[in-house]
Amino acid sequence: MRYLLLCAALCACAASGGRLVPAVEAPVLLAEFDSAAAAARLRWNQTPGPLFIAYELQRAAGEGQDFATIARIESAAETTAVDSGLAGDAAYRYRLLLHHSRPGRAPRVLVSGQVEGGIHQLVITWRLPSGFLPARLVVDGQGVVYVAGAGAARVERFDRAGHALGSWGLDAGQLACLEAVSLAVPALAVDRFNNLYVAYNLRERGKAPRSQWTKFDGRGRRIWTYPLEGIFARAVAVDPEGRIFIEGLNQLYQYNPEGELVARYPLPSLPAFGLHFWKGYFAVLVFPHLFTDGDWQAPRLVAYSGPERGEAVMIMGRDPASPEDSGGGLLRQPLDFAVDEATSRAFVLDAGHSGVVVFRHNRFLTSWGKAGDQEGAFRFSGAAEVVEDLLTGAAAQRQVMAGGIARDQEGYLYVADTFNNRIQKFGP
């Protein structure tokens, strides 16, 4: 027997030019999923050169899907690959096929173990009290998730795992919500000291809605409640210097942390909604296509250098290439957005796509979502009571669009899935 093994080894050595060829084993594949690039970075161990034919990298996208080849690599020294353009909240599986020759026999294929993962995958969902209709949310520096809705004049609080921490009441009156490009409900913002600011509107029978705002400290102590200038408060945001800005229908108001009015700025007639700060810039969703003579034919996310919204420094979104266009980067009915300044990403909640659209460096990066009530799906369209007459406060049930999104310091994303009455949390 030892004689036969020796003969076999000598034959293999002769077939390889006199060199003793090491045994070839199945490759070991590793993967790192990078949401900032919407990519999977793959690497594997190098195969001994004399018997190498090719690596074949395969991917299966989605549960129950078959593997398909995405790359064939014919250099044994090339042991890395990047699969870009990944969709969010999708399950990806990869495997590596090693094609190698065998002296005196037919070539063979060795298959690695599978690696799997994804970006922005669903982590958890939790429901709100019946009829709450969550539509705005924010996360403070301690990881407390604050949620405001169209159905109650209070703020619900949760930890990042969805455990209820109790609610803070705003007023004994009834909320006034306004149908604009998105449903205007109580607006939320936090400062670096974890104080919460809530700007909201209350119905008064036979009168215009009353706008006011409340400041809570991080323990829930109501510090003050003051009336607001202007007509119908729609957004509140705190800039990096701690200045507070509240947007009404036609003006932007600046306040200090004590609630004192500092300045007011007239807003251009261009339809816009939402307000967040991005690297100190005033970022809003703009709907110029609502003007028949506008140059843009679809909404944009625009960051302006100042409160007057005169100079745009960043613009995200594009016009449709055709009436049937539904491709990446085209915003249809954006509702809210969150930003990641470190990687220059914007996460736009878009009812037109029933999901989240992500931009990086002003360019489309990825997206995910679909309409429905199963986990990971969204319902941003539904019925809510809205003010029809700002002079009298008269209200009626209407079909509206609503939804909100926020990001915590670790990169997790929280979506207010309004008409499924729940919050959905997605991974970084």
Task: Please state what every model-predicted region is.
Residues 58-62, 99, 426:
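Predominantly extracellular/luminal cell-surface or secreted proteins
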Residues 97, 107-428:
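Eukaryotic scaffold repeat domains enriched in small/polar residues
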Residues 83-104:
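Beta-strand-rich modules
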Residues 15-51, 88, 102-121:
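Pro/Thr/Ser/Gly-rich low-complexity, intrinsically disordered linker/stalk tracts
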Residues 47-66:
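Solvent-exposed loop/turn segments flanking beta-strands in beta-repeat/beta-sandwich domains
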Residues 77-82:
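Short S/T/G- and acidic-enriched coil/turn segments that sit immediately N-terminal to beta-strands
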Residues 11-12:
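C-terminal motif of bacterial Sec signal peptides marking the signal peptidase cleavage site
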Residues 1-7:
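Sec-dependent signal peptide recognition
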